[in-house]
Amino acid sequence: AGVSTESGIPDFRSVDGLYHQKFDYPPETILSHSFFMRHTEAFFDFYRQRMLCPGAQPSRAHRILADMECAGKLTGIVTQNIDGLHQAAGSERVLELHGSIHRNYCLKCARFFPPEYIRDSEGVPKCPCGGIIKPDVVLYEEGLDEEVLSGAVQAIRKADTLIIGGTSLVVYPAAGLIRYFR
């Protein structure tokens, strides 16, 4: 989220990050699969307040990366961000390791919903079929999408230059992707 903090998106590990703020539960607990399943309404209260940032606009860094892609100097972006600001800035080849707040799906019928549906619903967002809608983001206790991870490995292997920014490099497996750069 470091690239997005300029856009008003909270990060996790900085002094002002979510991990240093007081909540009823630690953020890493709230953003876990088991918490989502057991305390779904509390999950969505936190998610709406802290993870959905409807007014966020791409930062200068997002725009520079998009301009580099447009100029043919950047072949892709591998990001842990879930905010979609790279795409909003114009980047097209974005691999979102942790998913996106812009995709939400029904756990029962797999129908997709925009983030506004989550934001504007009260309590636990439900599909017309009655199923709970889950953000398409990777929660703690969940694995990364293997197809996205494989795409990231391939993009890094093919790169002749690797720009790393806005990360503490402590979240695995994302932090381990550096080893694929030669």
List the model feature ranges, each with a label.
Residues 1-182:
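Conserved catalytic core of sirtuin-type NAD+-dependent deacylases
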